[in-house]
Amino acid sequence: MADQDRVEILSDRELGRTLVRLATQVLEQVDDTRRLMLLGIPTRGVELSRVLARELERMCGHPIAQGSIDPTFHRDDLERIGTRLAQTTTLPCNLEDRQVLLVDDVIFTGRTVRAAMEALHGWGRAQRVMLLVMVDRGHRELPIQPDFCGRTVPSRRSETIELRLRDVDGEEGVFLKRPIPPK
């Protein structure tokens, strides 16, 4: 029996179709895919960027630069969310004249993306920075919007949205998790 607090938003099949659609939209907006760099935001954004890079490589026929950017030390809300172990920032090449696509699983308040953009500026000046998210759940505290979005899912602040990827979790899909009320 499935957990009663977990609701499927995207099945593994729907997630696959959504990834293909997002990859297609990215290809339509990027001038030169050889200048494209995907940077995942920990934790699930890193794996999502790997999956997206593979799909883009399949579509355009050449490797896509892919890495990660850790925003931990640029956050303005560490005292509220608690400190986390910093992840390694991995840039596959210089940012200069690159079209950078920041990739995250879920956008919520916008604070993680703001911190990631601040961290990115410490590494150089990209030609263009775009944002791709699998799910936009609303509740923005900053004026940050994704350029590419897989699904918009209205949610309560008390709920969470979880992207599950086969390589990491053994299953694929997007799930809304509701807190179980006390008995």
Identify the residue ranges that each predicted region occupies.
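PRPP-associated nucleotide enzymes
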Residues: 1-183
